[in-house]
Amino acid sequence: MGFTDKQEALVNSSWESFKQNPGNSVLFYTIILEKAPAAKGMFSFLKDSAGVQDSPKLQSHAEKVFGMVRDSAAQLRATGGVVLGDATLGAIHIQKGVVDPHFAVVKEALLKTIKEVSGDKWSEELNTAWEVAYDALATAIKKAMV
């Protein structure tokens, strides 16, 4: 079974909720660093700070990550696959030292953040929609990391 219209709608609505509160970006990176403190140096906007502090770069990067997952949901529904819009993503991830376990950390942080953002609208179906879209995006990025 392919990615459904309903799954795409679930991702889109929670994406809109995510964007409405800048604190969601801070939460996302806080969860990442709780799971993988060494990842701090991979993010230019975090490496010289004492902790996760809100900044325009942090907001921009978080919105980019969540937005790419949202775009992946749209691609999955439309075509059944994900093609990266930015051909440099693989090289950037290699340059930053990203390895396979990092994708699992980001996935966990993304899903926990979406659960928090969604509040009483959260469901297993919503979680699965984000999970499937993220996994497809992560697979596309990993393929580009050559």
Swiss-Prot record:
Question: What InterPro entries does the annotation carry?
Answer: Globin, Globin-like_sf, Globin/Proto, Leghaemoglobin-like, Leghaemoglobin_Fe_BS
Which protein are we looking at? Leghemoglobin-3
Q: Which residues bind heme b?
A: S44, K64, H93, K96
Give the family this protein belongs to, as stated in its UniProt record. Belongs to the plant globin family.
Compartments in which it is found: Cytoplasm, Cytosol; Nucleus
Q: Quaternary state and partners of this protein?
A: Monomer.
Keywords, ordered alphabetically: Cytoplasm, Heme, Iron, Metal-binding, Nitration, Nitrogen fixation, Nodulation, Nucleus, Oxygen transport, Phosphoprotein, Transport
List the lineage, top down: Eukaryota, Viridiplantae, Streptophyta, Embryophyta, Tracheophyta
Q: Which SUPFAM superfamilies match?
A: Globin-like (SSF46458)
Tell me a GO biological process for this protein. nodulation
Q: Does the keyword tRNA processing apply?
A: no
Q: Which Pfam families match?
A: Globin (PF00042)
- An example molecular function term from Gene Ontology annotations: oxygen carrier activity
Residues annotated with Phosphoserine modification: S44
Which residues hold O2?
H61
Species name for this entry? Medicago sativa (Alfalfa)
Role noted for this protein: Leghemoglobin that reversibly binds oxygen O(2) through a pentacoordinated heme iron. In root nodules, facilitates the diffusion of oxygen to the bacteroids while preventing the bacterial nitrogenase from being inactivated by buffering dioxygen, nitric oxide and carbon monoxide, and promoting the formation of reactive oxygen species (ROS, e.g. H(2)O(2)). This role is essential for symbiotic nitrogen fixation (SNF).
- Enumerate the Gene3D superfamilies for this protein: Globins
